[in-house]
């Protein structure tokens, strides 16, 4: 029996329930570890993450709480894009979606191709490449980068400028995908909420670097105002880091859906989710089991 000593936990009854359930949860977590290498160390970190979450499960400003996923009632998750790096999880609901915006292209456009196959026009931007890997009549690419402030450069524009150029200032029900290697923090810090409301889905690969915790909190609180996280995935090309007392992946893929006209229930999936989650790097160990810290909600409430 695993014994945890945790002080200052107000709800003793819930903690007793946690102690009784934790051993079984550890066994389940153990099965999710894809490699026996450093297994004890990995499991120890997972337990530390659980304990930290337990301390903070009522703290709305903790990173774990700001990233808490929920399930969407009546909607099924599907994978869009490749079964490796470049694919993301959305829902099987594309009704009335005509346009998508994709920032950060490089040479991986399987996500964009799958959306194009659904008759969605993709407005694609990346100032670091010379051309797309292949042509599609639904692709609308420009060698332009995304910036948070107007800077009068020919190859850098704000989100608002791009929406105006494309005639989408009043468009709703769009899809947004952003993977711009750390630039996402300033973009989301400065973007108007009215622009975010134009997007039904928002999928982002967030890169945790040297920014202070307050900027992370600001961005996630802003996104959580009108959108709900329904899926998380760790990019295993990078590693696990610890900041503000918690473990998190340095590159974390997050899928949001707009709250309006949707209902949500408690999240009950274990990561990685079969047939949805795939390793970004097939040669490296999967690290998505760290996200199962959210199973504490189910332990505490049962």
State what each model feature region is.
Residues 75-153, 208:
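SAM cofactor-binding core of SAM-dependent methyltransferases
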Residues 111-113, 134-135, 186-191, 213-216, ...:
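A short acidic (Asp/Glu
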Residues 98-99, 175, 201:
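Structural motif
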Residues 25-94, 108, 154-172, 208-302:
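Rossmann-like AdoMet/SAM-dependent catalytic core
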Residues 186-208, 213-220:
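A short alpha/beta connector and helix-capping loop motif
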Residues 180-183:
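Switch II (G3) loop of P-loop NTPases
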Residues 137, 198, 250-252:
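Residues that flank catalytic or metal-binding motifs in active/ligand-binding sites
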Residues 1-43:
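Boundary detector for helix-to-coil junctions that initiate low-complexity/charged tails
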């Amino acid at each position: 029996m695993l014994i945890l000593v945790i002080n200052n936990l107000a709800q003793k009854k819930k903690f007793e329930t946690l102690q009784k359930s934790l051993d079984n949860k550890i066994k389940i977590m153990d099965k999710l570890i894809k490699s026996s290498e450093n297994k004890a160390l990995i499991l120890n970190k997972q337990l530390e993450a659980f304990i930290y979450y337990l301390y903070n499960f009522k703290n709305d400003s903790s990173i774990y709480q700001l990233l808490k996923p929920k399930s969407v009632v009546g909607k099924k998750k599907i994978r869009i894009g490749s079964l490796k790096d470049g694919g993301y999880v959305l829902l099987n609901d594309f009704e009335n979606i005509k346009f998508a915006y994709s920032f950060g292209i490089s040479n991986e456009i399987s996500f964009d191709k799958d959306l194009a196959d659904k008759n969605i026009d993709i407005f694609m931007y990346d100032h670091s490449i010379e051309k797309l890997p292949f042509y599609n009549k639904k692709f609308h690419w420009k060698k332009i980068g995304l910036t948070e402030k107007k800077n009068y450069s020919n190859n850098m524009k704000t989100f608002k400028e791009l929406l105006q150029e494309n005639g989408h200032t009043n468009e709703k029900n769009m899809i947004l995908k952003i993977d711009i290697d750390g630039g996402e923090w300033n973009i989301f810090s400065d973007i108007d909420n009215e622009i975010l409301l134009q997007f039904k889905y928002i999928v982002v690969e967030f890169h945790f670097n040297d920014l202070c915790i307050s900027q992370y909190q600001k961005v996630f609180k802003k996104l959580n105002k009108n959108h709900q996280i329904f899926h998380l995935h760790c990019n295993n090309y990078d590693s696990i880091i610890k900041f503000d007392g918690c473990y998190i992946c340095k590159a974390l893929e997050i899928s949001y859906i707009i709250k309006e006209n949707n209902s949500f229930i408690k999240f009950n999936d274990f990561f990685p989710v079969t047939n949805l989650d795939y390793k970004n790097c097939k040669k490296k160990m999967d690290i998505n089991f760290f996200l199962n810290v959210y199973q504490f909600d189910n332990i505490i409430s049962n």
